[in-house]
Amino acid sequence: MKTKTCKNLISNEQIQEVQEVYDTFKCRNGEMDKINIQYGFRALGVRLGEEEVEKIFKNQQYINFNSFLDIVTPLIYKIDVYASFEQAFSLFDRDGSGYITFDDLKTVAINLGEARSDSKLYNMIKRADLNGDKKISKIEFIQLLYWKKIY
């Protein structure tokens, strides 16, 4: 059943929040229609276009809670993962420049008690630096985490 998979992607508190949003925007028949689903998604911080909504409601007028949860869970998970990546990036981007430099990486390594040689730190930058500017942008950092499956 898909709901079990959903429970693995988001927390019980998030599932409870989805339930509260569903209960707030459901129709009198206990299910959600095309109009109210848009409100529900927005309340959860998710934006869907008209075409995506049409796909959800293909050949039906309403969806039940389990369907709503199955649809919204991966979207919430993506938002959470991206937010976690941004938070991790900001820990490395010590000066808020939008980049992780060699000095940023070295400072973090020292603060974590990770003794790394300069050459190892430069190699770490080099592996993540996709455009060759000798620093890691937020996009490069996130791509590295996805590529290495560190999430």
Swiss-Prot record:
Coiled coil: none annotated. InterPro entries: Centrin_CML-like, EF-hand-dom_pair, EF_Hand_1_Ca_BS, EF_hand_dom. Residues 80-115, 116-151 form the EF-hand domain. Keywords: Calcium, Cell cycle, Cell division, Cytoplasm, Cytoskeleton, Metal-binding, Mitosis, Nucleus, Repeat. GO terms for biological process: cell division; microtubule cytoskeleton organization. GO terms for cellular component: centriole; centrosome; cytoplasm; nucleus. Binds two moles of calcium per mole of protein. Signal peptide: none annotated. Plays a fundamental role in microtubule-organizing center structure and function. It is found in: Cytoplasm, Cytoskeleton, Microtubule organizing center, Centrosome; Nucleus. This is Centrin-A. Belongs to the centrin family. Ca(2+) 1 binds at residues 93, 95, 97, 99, 104. It comes from the Eukaryota. GO terms for molecular function: calcium ion binding.
